[in-house]
UniProtKB/Swiss-Prot annotation:
NCBIfam families: CPA3_mnhG_phaG, PRK12674.2-1. Pfam families: PhaG_MnhG_YufB. InterPro entries: PhaG_MnhG_YufB (IPR005133). The lineage of its organism: Bacteria, Pseudomonadati, Pseudomonadota, Alphaproteobacteria, Rickettsiales. It comes from Rickettsia prowazekii (strain Madrid E). GO terms for molecular function: sodium:proton antiporter activity. This is UPF0091 protein RP266. It comes from the Bacteria.
């Protein structure tokens, strides 16, 4: 029963992280900072929620599957985020500072 309440607490922490990441996603000005907010949501909050659901789950096989999914997300999401950031850098997507400097110079 204690594991159930720990799982609920961990899921609440994960949901708080998701909502704060969503707020950051809408408030950040350019692609790269929005990419950072999205990767924090996917790399931190989703695995935390999955581990919380694994604590709540009574069946051991389902708990192992949830923990395995959380580990895969923790390992693979930073690679995907890096590839997306590098591709956008190679495509020369401008940052907020360069756009702001061009407005100031005019």
């Amino acid at each position: 029963m204690t594991l159930y309440y720990i799982g609920i607490l961990v899921v609440i922490i994960g949901l708080f992280s998701i909502f704060s990441g969503i707020i950051g996603f809408f408030r950040f000005p350019d692609f790269y900072t929005k990419l950072h907010a999205a990767s924090v949501i996917e790399s931190f909050a989703v695995p935390i929620c999955l581990i919380g659901f694994a604590c709540i789950e009574l069946d051991m096989l389902n708990s192992i599957k949830l923990i395995l999914a959380a580990l895969l997300i923790l390992l693979l999401n930073p690679v995907a985020t890096h590839a997306l950031g590098k591709a956008s850098l190679l495509m020369k997507i401008r940052t907020y500072n360069t756009v702001l400097l061009k407005k100031i110079r005019k």
